[in-house]
Every structure is written in structure tokens, then in C-alpha cells.
């Protein structure tokens, strides 16, 4: 699973998710990509589940590029814990994905296989997505 090797601070602010992604909005490496149409946090477990779904369907053919990395920790407190007493313990890692960001790319397989693999990955993610093809240069 994807986790940072080292971080300067264990707990970070939640931040805002306004507007569109600044970069990474086009297919850069493969032939097809999975682009977010809504914004959300995506956990390292969700990224891994999508990766496994794609690679299992493609059966060792082609290549998958993961263009997001969960660099932000999220925290939570226990169920019966009262308010106050500081921020909770780090629970996991997330990547804030804004709309327009291409999260996964697939290449080296026929179009039908690539589209089906990306469709399987869509079901593992908490954002609405669309499958896009590389633009002819």
C-alpha cells in the first residue's frame, strides 16, 4: 500500500477542495485515463483496491500508471472520547483529488480491455469519474 516514507508533521490541517485541479488533467503516459469529475479524499486503500481490480482484469498485459499519491494523514478520535484533549491519532493516508485530475492511466492493451479495466476501478473509488483517451498530437 502507498504510504509516505517520512513526513515532517504527523498531523495536518484538512484544507479546502475548491475549484479544479491545477495540473495533471491530461493523459500523459498511457493511452486511456480515469479522470475525476467530482472532488474528494481518496485513501491509500481505495487506490490499492482500484489498482488490483485493473491489474487482475488485464492479466499481466499492459501497464498501469498511478498518478496520485496519498501524502496527507487523516486523524480520528475513539468512539467514546470526549471533546477536547487535542487532535486525534493518525488513522491513515489520503490524497485530496480535485475535479479534472487524471488518477490512473492504462496502456499497452486493446481499447476494450483498457475501458473495462478502468470501469472496474471506477467502482472502487468515492469520486465520480470518466474514462478519457489520449488526444492525438
UniProtKB/Swiss-Prot annotation:
A Pfam family: Ribosomal_L16
Gene3D superfamilies per UniProt: Ribosomal protein L10e/L16 (3.90.1170.10)
Record-level GO cellular component terms: cytosolic large ribosomal subunit
Keyword line: Ribonucleoprotein, Ribosomal protein, RNA-binding, rRNA-binding, tRNA-binding
One Gene Ontology term from the biological process aspect of the record: translation
Record-annotated disulphide pairs: none
InterPro entries xref list: Ribosomal_uL16, Ribosomal_uL16_bact-type, Ribosomal_uL16_CS, Ribosomal_uL16_dom, Ribosomal_uL16_sf
Xref: NCBIfam families: rplP_bact
Assembly behavior: Part of the 50S ribosomal subunit.
Function: Binds 23S rRNA and is also seen to make contacts with the A and possibly P site tRNAs.
Name assigned to this protein: Large ribosomal subunit protein uL16
Organism encoding this protein: Leuconostoc citreum (strain KM20)
Amino acid at each position: 500500500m502507498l504510504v509516505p516514507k517520512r513526513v515532517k508533521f504527523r498531523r495536518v490541517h484538512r484544507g479546502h477542495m475548491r475549484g479544479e485541479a491545477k495540473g495533471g488533467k491530461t493523459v500523459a503516459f498511457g493511452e486511456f485515463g480515469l479522470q475525476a469529475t467530482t472532488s474528494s479524499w481518496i485513501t491509500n486503500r481505495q487506490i490499492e483496491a482500484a489498482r488490483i481490480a485493473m491489474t487482475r482484469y488485464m492479466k499481466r498485459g499492459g501497464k498501469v500508471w498511478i498518478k496520485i499519491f496519498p501524502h496527507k494523514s487523516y486523524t480520528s478520535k475513539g468512539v467514546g472520547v470526549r471533546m477536547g484533549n487535542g487532535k486525534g491519532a493518525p488513522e491513515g493516508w489520503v490524497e485530496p483529488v480535485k475535479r479534472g485530475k487524471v488518477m490512473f492511466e492504462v496502456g499497452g492493451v486493446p481499447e476494450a480491455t483498457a475501458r473495462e479495466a478502468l470501469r472496474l476501478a471506477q467502482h472502487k473509488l468515492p469520486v465520480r469519474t470518466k474514462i478519457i483517451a489520449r488526444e492525438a498530437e
